[in-house]
């Protein structure tokens, strides 16, 4: 099992953020993901850390499809793949109407079709082919004008891995069909089939197996002999996910928890959050949900969670280590890595792994 982290910037402390990645690379972390919502973009920070690292893979986790043309996504991917000497991973997601329409002023429509066509055009461009495409959302060149089918002036970069952050059944099937990896959220190993069944259906449609995808999920990591102390601070974040990451009509994260059997909780927390009762919303998040979506407690308890992810079929554990300082975060990360390696040693001598 591989380990991934996220590049997170507190305020404007870019030096601290980049040093975290440099040290994580030294410890053996496999990849780092840079995200975007309505703050910093996902791309620029990766260029910053690419110049300071040599081995760790660098991924956009995620670029919001629809905020950039497919050609610009391809140009960005080829630039980062070139400057990082092949370490770049292109992570894409559709975001949601509140961000796409509210922040970018772009209509949130046909998200699955838009994503599929974006990937088609990106792969066409990165292979060095002329951009000629006729889809339901995109058509290149644009008809009725003076545009020509262009070939990228950059050197071809075929085979850039594409990861999709998807949650709905239809988008999960598309991920299994056309992507190289999946960036999961709202995930609990005990309910992995809520996602994996759809990923597998898409993979089968493309004549391949789920084992050909890198499945990346995980959560917050914190060590303590008093696990009860670690639970309450995680509840506001889950309440935010259930209540604020979308509208009442469109919240893909909330829908995922409902499909996993937490419909009553998801609806109640969402209702309270949208009514402005955020503390009440957080208080309704059950301890069980916190423990299932994170890796908390003693080393033995965290190891059990690692094993649960492994048995479910997860190939890369994406984690956020606890710590108020750089040193504290790295200490947590180092303990986690040691447990992952110890777990992998046990697998090597015969411990079972779930079929994917």
Label each residue range with its predicted role.
Residues 1-60, 66, 160, 350-355:
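N-terminal beta1-alpha1-beta2 module of alpha/beta enzyme domains
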Residues 3-15, 63-70, 156-167, 221-222, ...:
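Active-site mouth loops of central-metabolism enzymes
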Residues 3-7, 32-34, 58-61, 88-92, ...:
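Hydrophobic faces of well-ordered beta-strands that scaffold small-molecule active sites
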Residues 12-24, 76, 166-174, 234, ...:
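Short, acidic/polar
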Residues 29, 85, 179-180, 314:
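A structural motif
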Residues 40-47, 188-203, 327-331:
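Active-site-adjacent beta->alpha loops and helix N-cap segments on the catalytic face
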Residues 109-153, 193-311, 345-356:
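An alpha-helical appendage that flanks or caps ligand/catalytic pockets
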